Amino acid sequence: MVPPPPPPSRLLLVALVGLLSLHEVVAEPAEEAGTRCPEGLWPLPPQVLPRVTYTQVRQGQAEGITFFYHPCAHLWLKLQLAVLAHLCVAKPTLIPDFSLPWDRPLVLTAWGTALEMAWIEPAWAAQWLKRQWRRRRRKQRKSVWFLSDNLFGPTPMMPAPRRGKLCGRRCVQAPTLAFALRSWRPPGVEVTSRGPRRSSLSVVKKRGLRAALGLQSTPSGLRVSLASSQSLKAQQRTLGNSSVAPVSLMTGVTEGNGRFRTEAQMPSGQGNPGGCACPGQVSPAPRAAVPPRVARGPTPRTEEAAWAAMALTFLLVLLTLATLCTRLHRNFRRSESIYWGPTSDSQDTVAAILKRRLPLPSRRIKRSRRRPLLPPTPDSGPDSESSD
């Protein structure tokens, strides 16, 4: 009898294991080989949200990105952690740690902070790694100002590249890894629904992630007060107008392995696979809300344009009224009056009316300039001239 074909999730898992060659990922296989779990491997823990804690760099541990896991953790969890480490870090370092609890057997540390996970959350891990890497770069840039310009090469404030460098030639987008890890569930394990928040999980998880990753405790383990005005303003700017519940902080608890933890409880829900651990690539990770632009006042050109528009409108209205008045005046017919005499066709012109109404001036007799002033004498006639 032919056995049934394996499910697609198992085929995808085998393909990824062969592609990544995970037998080269584990840094200390000899230490894990000598350990034995008396009760066997642990069952899968309940799926809870990751937790950001403060940790100290141990002796012999390279400063950078390190992946810790409990040797008795479930095989699926260890395999997912190895795949995540190989995809997000160029040369990952995986170290077994017996001090990890059962509910969160996977820990990701980077430059003094740790991300404790019960299940692998690629979006959380990628966004958290990128955030820590940016903080590290900002600190290094600030420290450069205090160094001398004559120093060359790596300095204590700017360590040289080593194992644990973020990203590499096999860096993969976090959504791709999240899609693969969602199908990596042991047989019989199903992801339970989270209730009515299922529809808005992506927005809630993204903004809750940014609010949680910014919470780091101090070595004293003091309680962070939610009544402080600065923290409230920062959370309001980060969360925006969403329906995310406020982050509840708990007091820091000092553990035996030297970590001071601060729990950040956020809204439950499955993470939306967004963000990438690569700093040089464009990431669809959640971003801070863009502040509204300040309204600018009117400029001289806008005022001139407004005045020109008003003047054109006034001229147009004036021209329209003049045209209407002219049409009405032409079509208007005057009735008979006592002042204006009746005419045959009632079409008298102004000149005709003036000629008829104005009195004619009296004519004066003009004297000719050729007439003599003295009357003629009888001797000065033409007969006397002819007799001479």
Curated annotation (Swiss-Prot):
Its main location: membrane. Residues 326-388 are cytoplasmic. Residues 1-27 form the signal peptide. It is a single-pass type I membrane protein. The chain crosses the membrane at residues 305-325. It is found in: Cell membrane; Cytoplasm. The keyword Chaperone does not apply. Residues 28-304 are extracellular. Residues 361-388 are annotated as: Disordered. It comes from the Eukaryota. GO terms for biological process: negative regulation of cell cycle; response to UV; response to xenobiotic stimulus. GO terms for cellular component: cytoplasm; plasma membrane. The keyword Signal applies. Keywords: Cell membrane, Cytoplasm, Membrane, Signal, Transmembrane, Transmembrane helix. Residues 361-372 have a biased composition (Basic residues). May act as a tumor suppressor. Inhibits tumor cell growth, when overexpressed. This is Tumor protein p53-inducible protein 13. It comes from Rattus norvegicus (Rat).
